[in-house]
Amino acid sequence: MTILTHTLGFPRVGLRRELKKAQESYWAGNTTREALLAVGRELRARHWEQQKQAGIDLLPVGDFAWYDHVLTTSLLLGNVPARHQNNDGSVDIDTLFRIGRGRAPTGEPAAAAEMTKWFNTNYHYIVPEFSKGQQFRLTWTQLLEEVDEALALGHKIKPVLLGPVTYLWLGKVKGEPFDRLTLLKDILPVYQHVLAELAKRGIEWVQIDEPALVLELPQAWLDAFKPAYDALAGQVKLLLTTYFEGVTPNLDTIIALPVQGLHVDLIHGKDDVAELHQRLPVDWLLSAGLINGRNVWRADLTEKYAQINAIVGKRALWVASSCSLLHSPIDLSVETRLDTEVKSWFAFALQKCGELALLRDALNSGETAALEEWSAPIQARRHSRRVHNAAVEKRLAAITAQDSQRENPYEVRAEAQRARFKLPAWPTTTIGSFPQTTEIRGLRLDFKKGNLDANHYRTGIAEHIKQAIIEQERLGLDVLVHGEAERNDMVEYFGEHLDGFVFTQNGWVQSYGSRCVKPPVVIGDISRPAPITVEWAKYAQSLTDKPVKGMLTGPVTILCWSFPREDVTRETIAKQIALALRDEVADLEAAGIGIIQIDEPALREGLPLRRSDWDAYLEWGVEAFRINAAVAKDETQIHTHMCYCEFNDIMDSIAALDADVITIETSRSDMELLESFEAFDYPNEIGPGVYDIHSPNVPSVEWIEALLKKAAQRIPAQRLWVNPDCGLKTRGWPETRAALANMVKAAHNLRQAK
């Protein structure tokens, strides 16, 4: 039985972010739809060929998406909210963009659908909306068209589909409440139709993703898998695909299904290969996810060989990435600025394909010399001076409970803060960043490339900060920000100023739609060699009598949005970052900054997928935040910001952060998130986001007032702040001014109505 290689998916955006540029050009009306579609075809063809040349035997098709793969599945099933539909009932790429962005080059603007994190990753998806009695039909044939493309190019392929049960699990009911699982019988005919079309094309295997099977699902949802897969069986071979955790707790459900193979994540799961081999039906193929799809580290292939070799020849076996390589940068070979030592520790998506090929060849032949050669740099890294810092390790070991306690409780601090700031009712602020204009990005790029000296760069940044302060004062905001003109990314910026991180030139990964991020890589112990944000915060405060917030990214978010080390725990990394940023809080306070925001948008996304593992994570995650913040005096107001969160199941931990003010993303969920704070009787101040910054649509004064009145039904008005959902870096100035003017006007109206 020859072992084959495959990947669960590949990065879509292109090495130079070609997809992002094509999307944004199309949205701006600068290119045609045909030109956009052509870029997609070119990228798919290139990526299939690259994977093939790197040694992948079965290429994934259907992993490409114009926004995200869950939204693609919604269109496949004809699940289009009424507000986004074309007048003639047809579905096209602009339909997709209206759902994701709220607008497109054609059709009427409408509120974008809700967006949230994909399991515990930094990738996002558009949440499917379900209504009672909803009808489904095959309306979007992107998958079939891409299968035809790949077959025409002569590739051996494996189409990829998001499974029906996971799709329903990921959605939300809109309108009259009902059990969305009852829609399963209605979407299965569409899946049957698609599988029949794939069978007609001679497809042997289909990868059907059911990552919900790694969760602690309610019994009714577990019970739904058997009838669903009974309905889908028989047309093609199905590779039931799971990732991000192990499957052992749900293995009884899985082995009862009429599928022909199972993919398991052997990186993030704790499944035992021998037990899986023993319990799976003897005729099933096992796809072993041995190469980490979510990081940038070179794999120890000798270890992977030992992990799987015992079952070679005993059942059909494929070797694969643990999950889609979507979460990894594309190609390490184009990184020219990493020094040789550090570069030897890494592997990006194409190199991971090469790792799979090396592993396949060794498992098929029994020859392991190539694996030992590949793995040698990993042994060297374990002893590198660039990894270990004795002073950091000593400080971490000396942390006490007192280091995570503010001097006094919130009630005492709030009095001191009210006396200091004298803010009006319904105080207005923004979350931190202002539009990153072409001029700002050009300024940073010229400085980075050496085309601009430090003095001219600093003069330019200072002018943009000054303009941001002027804009905010003109708008009438109460608490200002400096706008973050000097920051390329909220995590990358801090990583650049902390020891223990390295950066790539082209290590882009998709976050959502056209948004890409270039995560820093934690290669060693973390420390702060010098103040990071103090100079610009102090300058901004000197321009105004209103308070200006100091802006920090929190330790858990820096951890979650970086590629972490694998040789220490996530807790260790988070607390090292917290200690470094604790010094930053102290320095900001000493410089006269009275309000300091520590953003933790990733706190919830870092949760383990199984609820039984949550407590330990939340304990150290909360402690890291408190270590970061607790150095502040009573009269210093600590804010935190979170987005895409459902809080009801972690409210104890949110309260335990003990932030004086929390701002949250609520507009897309119509203030639903505040129910959690109301039920918990959250004691501190809250800024529910009153408009969606991910959409270019400008909210009306009436819309914002209505949301704030709804918020005041749940939270006492004296504890409410008024702010957008998130930072404004991706927006343009015209819509930013208009939206903030309406937001300030709404707050003024509510003050006058008291």
UniProtKB/Swiss-Prot annotation:
EC number: 2.1.1.14
Catalytic activity: 5-methyltetrahydropteroyltri-L-glutamate + L-homocysteine = tetrahydropteroyltri-L-glutamate + L-methionine
Leader peptide range in chain numbering: none
UniProt remark on cofactor binding: Binds 1 zinc ion per subunit.
Pathway: Amino-acid biosynthesis; L-methionine biosynthesis via de novo pathway; L-methionine from L-homocysteine (MetE route): step 1/1
Cofactor: Zn(2+)
Residue sites binding L-methionine per the record: 431-433, 484, 599
Protein residues bound to 5-methyltetrahydropteroyltri-L-glutamate: 17-20, 117, 515-516, 561, 605
Active site: 694 (proton donor)
One BP annotation, GO: methionine biosynthetic process
Enzyme class: transferase
Pfam families listed in its UniProt record: Meth_synt_1, Meth_synt_2
Chain positions recorded as Zn(2+) binding sites: 641, 643, 665, 726
Binding site for L-homocysteine: 431-433, 484, 599
CDD domains from the UniProt entry: CIMS_C_terminal_like, CIMS_N_terminal_like
Alphabetic keyword roster: Amino-acid biosynthesis, Metal-binding, Methionine biosynthesis, Methyltransferase, Repeat, Transferase, Zinc
GO molecular function per UniProt: 5-methyltetrahydropteroyltriglutamate-homocysteine S-methyltransferase activity; zinc ion binding
Matches recorded under Gene3D superfamilies: 3.20.20.210
Family: Belongs to the vitamin-B12 independent methionine synthase family.
Task of the protein: Catalyzes the transfer of a methyl group from 5-methyltetrahydrofolate to homocysteine resulting in methionine formation.
Protein name as annotated: 5-methyltetrahydropteroyltriglutamate--homocysteine methyltransferase
Organism: Salmonella typhimurium (strain LT2 / SGSC1412 / ATCC 700720)
